[in-house]
Amino acid sequence: MAKNILLLNGPNLNMLGSREPEVYGSATLADVERAATEQASQAGAKLTAFQSNHEGVLIDRIQAAKKEGVDAIIINPGGLTHSSVSLRDALASVALPFVEVHVSNIHQREAFRHHSYLSGIAVGVICGLGIDGYTAAISFALKKL
């Protein structure tokens, strides 16, 4: 059976390409989603991409994932990385393997960005590879999860 991957992007990631391009690059979220969908499709997998600026909407999407037959989640939680216990709890409650992705290297940035509420329960964490981090996460999910 084909793998089913859910790609989640949190607050402000809809601004990729225009928000601080010196930090996040010039690729847009549409570029990321298009490349991710194509990568999964070429491997015979299904990838569904979803972005929201709202914590509760992301939690609802995570909770629905198990019922939808999602096999793995790739999530860039944006700023919720450093503040959302609720997002962590939602991911823990569905017990689906997930990879945390960050476009920038959060450990080279402001001190408040160094802590992630999600990393401790993630299968893996990828940061600082630009949008190539998504490619790496999808590749890992397809091979290992």
From Swiss-Prot:
Organism domain of life: Bacteria
GO MF: 3-dehydroquinate dehydratase activity
Positions annotated as active site in the UniProt record: Y24, H102
InterPro entries recorded: DHquinase_II, DHquinase_II_CS, DHquinase_II_sf
Site features described as Transition state stabilizer, chain residue numbers: R19
Catalysed reaction, written as an equation: 3-dehydroquinate = 3-dehydroshikimate + H2O
Keywords attached to this entry: Amino-acid biosynthesis, Aromatic amino acid biosynthesis, Lyase
Enzyme class, spelled out: lyase
Assembly and interaction partners: Homododecamer.
Biological role stated in the UniProt entry: Catalyzes a trans-dehydration via an enolate intermediate.
Family that this chain belongs to: Belongs to the type-II 3-dehydroquinase family.
Protein name: 3-dehydroquinate dehydratase
Natural source organism: Herminiimonas arsenicoxydans
Taxon lineage: Bacteria, Pseudomonadati, Pseudomonadota, Betaproteobacteria, Burkholderiales
Originating gene: aroQ
